Amino acid sequence: MEKIAIIGAGRVGESTAQFLAKNDTCRELVLLDVREGAAEGAALDIQETAPLFGFDTRLKGGTDAAILSGAELVVITAGIPRKPGMSRSDVLDTNVAILDKLVDGIMEHAPDAMLLLVSNPVDVLTYRAWQRTGWPRNRVFGQAGVLDSSRMASFVALETGLSVNDINAMVLGGHGDSMVPMLRYSTINGIPVRHFLSEEAIARIVERTRHGGAEILALKQTSSAYDAPAAAIAAMVDAIALDRKRVLPTVALLEGEYGERDVAMGVPCILGRNGVESVIELPLEPSERKEFDQSLAGVRDDINRLK
């Protein structure tokens, strides 16, 4: 990919830029931030690691949205973060106002770009960006399930003592406490995780996955998680930039899948050069469908606050 932009040079944005640059994911990587010098400093700091890591990506930063011109993919990490005790929905009103201004700038300077939403609450902001741009759903999507699934796989590895390389986990639904860890679709080298874990251990893993971000926030106190979210973003960007056709849980607009429309939710998608190239509709058992619907209801409630 020729050019990628990251809006927000905070911890998640800067860490994402590090991953993308080290992997030579694009030829040009730009960072945009309203804070004077923040994006420029982050870009320069990462650029100076190029001789050590051996990448050729060129980075630059700025405060003017014109820097987005020519970007094929724009990653939005800007917004106010959660503080201890806050839910992702608690930052909704402020982050929607921020998003609206950002989207207007993107539409002016990078009208052909794809948008990858990261700021919380990501399901609602993805819907808002899609609604405001009027772009097709393949071009507007969000990151949540890749991170949640990575957390779940990590906890399975820690609980079993087995290699994380053999573990595949799947988490669907909204990116919040009502997310839906899909145990039936989570395996260790093709074997269902329930073969290796007791129901008590599974319950612990599910609960820890649902509150993974809050756990880190409570421990750090001064910041949310940023390395794992950035790695999740980088995995999605890699799938798109290199047209890998990967199946990854993605916040996507539903157009009849799962019997739903006019809502953005975490569902398995095929990611490639055109963004969300397909939404995969999994058959759900009654208990899974109940959890999915509960998660969906929470997202719809937040979306309805915007209408």
UniProtKB/Swiss-Prot annotation:
Query: Which parts of the sequence bind substrate?
Result: R82, R88, N120, R151
- One biological process term in Gene Ontology: lactate metabolic process
Q: Which reaction does it catalyse?
A: (S)-malate + NAD(+) = oxaloacetate + NADH + H(+)
- Please name the top-level EC class of this enzyme: oxidoreductase
- List ligand-binding residues for NAD(+): G8, A9, G10, R11, V12, G13, D33, N95, V118, S119, N120
Q: Which is an annotated GO molecular function term of this record?
A: L-malate dehydrogenase (NAD+) activity
Q: Which Pfam families match?
A: Ldh_1_C, Ldh_1_N
Q: What is its EC number?
A: 1.1.1.37
Give the annotated active site: H175
Assigned keywords, A-Z: NAD, Oxidoreductase, Tricarboxylic acid cycle
Q: What's the superkingdom here? A: Bacteria
- What InterPro entries does the annotation carry? L-lactate/malate_DH, Lactate/malate_DH_C, Lactate/malate_DH_N, Lactate_DH/Glyco_Ohase_4_C, Malate_DH_type3, NAD(P)-bd_dom_sf
> What Gene3D superfamilies does the record point to?
Lactate dehydrogenase/glycoside hydrolase, family 4, C-terminal (3.90.110.10), NAD(P)-binding Rossmann-like Domain (3.40.50.720)
Physiological role:
Catalyzes the reversible oxidation of malate to oxaloacetate.
Indicate the family of this protein. Belongs to the LDH/MDH superfamily. MDH type 3 family.
Q: What is this protein called?
A: Malate dehydrogenase
From what organism does this protein derive? Thioalkalivibrio sulfidiphilus (strain HL-EbGR7)
Task: Give the gene that encodes this protein.
Answer: mdh
